[in-house]
Amino acid sequence: MKKYLMMAFVAMMSVANVSAQNIPVGMRMEIGETERDKSEYSLFTYKDEDGTFGYYLSLGRVTKILGAIRDDITDMSFDDIRETSICLGGTKDEAFATLDSILALYNEELETSVEFQGRAVTGSGRLGEPATSQCVVKKNLVGGKRLQFIFTSGKRQVSTYLPKSVVKDLRRDLKIDVKLHPKQHR
């Protein structure tokens, strides 16, 4: 009886291991998550419908009053953008390199600007079309620096802030996840 239970357990683990390598299309697989100042930040992998795989850094929920963003014509419009994210790359090595380059930005002068490939997460939970986001080094209110990511879509503009401690925490989470689940990472 023990032999059959052990064989069933090994078979179940084999199936789980194979399925862990094949991420379903359009599904977000969380690697790490952290909260700061009432904002949630996360690191996740995502596979597009065309088969493109990538690591993404969620910059937190978009804070808007009732989901509205200012518009020049109507002065108010509704958008279904829930959160913004930037692409870290298609492999774990690219993701680590991008996280390291983001950490290096905190040592740059104020108002230094860099562009990142970003994507907005819509109300359906799926990533939208790739867009360029601008990252600007800003002074923190208490001291130190933080990064402001600005996403522009037509006349609309959404901005989010990223503290240094969040990047360090999520980099550590990625490092741990790569050690715990090496077959899930490319």
For the regions a protein language model found, what residue spans apply to each?
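Sec-dependent N-terminal signal peptides
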Residues: Y4-S14
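Positively charged, low-complexity terminal tracts
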Residues: S19-R186
